[in-house]
Curated annotation (Swiss-Prot):
Its EC number is 3.1.1.4. The lineage of its organism: Eukaryota, Metazoa, Chordata, Craniata, Vertebrata. It comes from the Eukaryota. GO terms for biological process: arachidonate secretion; lipid catabolic process; negative regulation of T cell proliferation; phospholipid metabolic process. Disulfide bonds join C26-C115, C28-C44, C43-C95, C49-C122, C50-C88, C57-C81, C75-C86. This is Basic phospholipase A2 Ceg-N6. It comes from Cerrophidion godmani. The active site is at H47, D89. Coiled coil: none annotated.
Length: 122
């Protein structure tokens, strides 16, 4: 769920999802359109695509199990939905951590109306 995703982001980046990733670029936060602005925004685009594939799941509210050790996140046991949601969140959190050096403050609170490029498909 979103609280667990926030915790994963904190593990991988040492930053809180709010405010750093909730309205970053064109895809971080609710919705998304246009082209991702940078590598961090692409992490959000891919995360949105991952969630879209989970048609019979509730990724924002379903609780899953996971653990971490030395900065490595491991998804635990659970239903197929729980495992897939956890994996979507884990991959995005790792992506944020990988791209931390190229995070740009100018894309924080980025206005949607500037996301005018044609949208990419998943």
């Amino acid at each position: 769920n979103l609280l667990q995703f926030n915790k994963m982001i904190k593990i991988m980046t040492k930053k809180n999802a709010v405010p750093f990733y909730t309205s970053y670029g064109c895809y971080c936060g609710w919705g998304g359109r246009g082209k991702p602005k940078d590598a961090t925004d692409r992490c959000c685009f891919e995360h949105d695509c991952c969630y879209e594939k989970l048609t019979d799941c509730s990724p924002k509210t379903d609780i899953y199990s996971y653990s971490w050790k030395s900065g490595v996140i491991i998804c635990g046991e659970g239903t197929p939905c729980e495992k897939q949601i956890c994996e979507c969140d884990r991959v995005a959190a790792v992506c944020f951590g990988t791209n931390l050096r190229t995070y740009k403050k100018r894309y924080m609170f980025y206005p949607d109306f500037l996301c005018t490029d044609p949208s990419e498909k998943c």
